[in-house]
Amino acid sequence: MIKSNQNGRSMIEMLGVLAIIGVLSVGGIVGYSKAMDKYKTNQVLNGVTHTINNIKTLFMAQNNVKGLNTKEAYDAGVIPDEFKPDNENLAALSSVVHSYGGTVKVVATTVDGKETGDETTYYAIKIEGLPRNVAMEIATQYWGDSGDLVSVNLNDGKQSAGN
């Protein structure tokens, strides 16, 4: 009588299990990466939307945003929590940082986009350091009746690394 000694798994079966685990892991990492990118995109969109709405609410009665800048907007609570100060020195605040690490600036402008002059009754939001797909998503948003918003400037010719 021949004894059969087949109590364990074969090496081929174990390699198959490892391959399945590897495929599932790669899928999970890709899914997580896409989810984080969507989260960051939504953070930027929400921040811009809240900033526009807050400026509209705060300056609606005045019908003039002369002198509005990032520091004044931050001090007045116009800039939401989605955007963080770019440095610890809030007295010298010139921009805030969005979720992709780029900058956001709020500036008073004339209707033709000049940042100086006595008739700066409009404002612009300047966003730099966005990936191309996020810039496109923001550019295609319907901003509705955004009051005195002249423009949302995206990247100003700069791209974030790798995009």
What would you call each of these model-derived segments?
Residues 1-47:
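N-terminal single-pass transmembrane signal-anchor helix
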Residues 2, 12, 20-21, 29, ...:
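Weak global preference for isoleucine
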Residues 33-68, 72:
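Membrane-proximal N-terminal amphipathic helix
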Residues 61-163:
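Periplasmic/extracellular, small/polar-rich flexible segments of pilin-like filament-forming proteins
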